[in-house]
Amino acid sequence: MEAKKRIFSGIQPSGELTLGSYMGALKNWVSLQDEYDCLYCIVDMHAITVRQVPADLRRRSVAQLAQYIACGLDPEKNIMFIQSHVPQHAELSWVLGCYTQFGELSRMTQFKDKAKKHADNITAGLFTYPVLMAADILLYQSDLVPVGDDQRQHVELCRNIATRFNNWFPDTFTLPEAFVPKMGARIMSLGQPENKMSKSEPDGCVFLMDKPEDIMRKFKRAVTDCETAVRYDQQNKPGISNLLTIY
């Protein structure tokens, strides 16, 4: 019997999960757990590139793991863990950093974007973020890494680092491939349906841990349009189309 391919995905403990995260990603992850050998890591070390309150970060990390299980990720079928609990992530990151070129990191578009948004907090940790990500992936000999378009460049860098290391020490690391799973529904804001549902806009965002009465209130206030017709038309009727997608 052919061995299952291994999937690694790291998720930052950024807070409560939303309806968008569930329909856009988590439902698909649940469907992958029978076909692949899946590792899901709460990457709390990545999260500290932005200032954190340690107690809050620990609480969110544990709470997020619990929510994944509640959404259907079976701990008997998946390995789920917190990044900082495995010191080999940081250890391997240092080793891989010695095989990573400064110019490669300088070209990372996500670093450039985040540096613009957080100009007062451009740290070495933010700059070397992709090296720690490579360590996360390579440590477990991962075959596939589920990514969005904004992370593809990081997987390519990971492959380059692994290839360079393997040239010195043959067959050490498996070369991972970017994996684009079946796309989930793209859920938009209830208040601004032209924008993706985001935690930064609480009134337009449904959190999985919201009380039933709060969920009802948010949907009752959801933006629609002045027409009487109910039909799916993302361009001309984004509000109605978003509600139909959720339904």
Question: What residues fall within each predicted segment?
Answer:
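N-terminal Rossmann-like or analogous alpha/beta NTP/dinucleotide-binding catalytic cores
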Residues: 2-135
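Active-site cores that bind ATP or allylic diphosphates and position pyrophosphate for catalysis
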Residues: 112-247
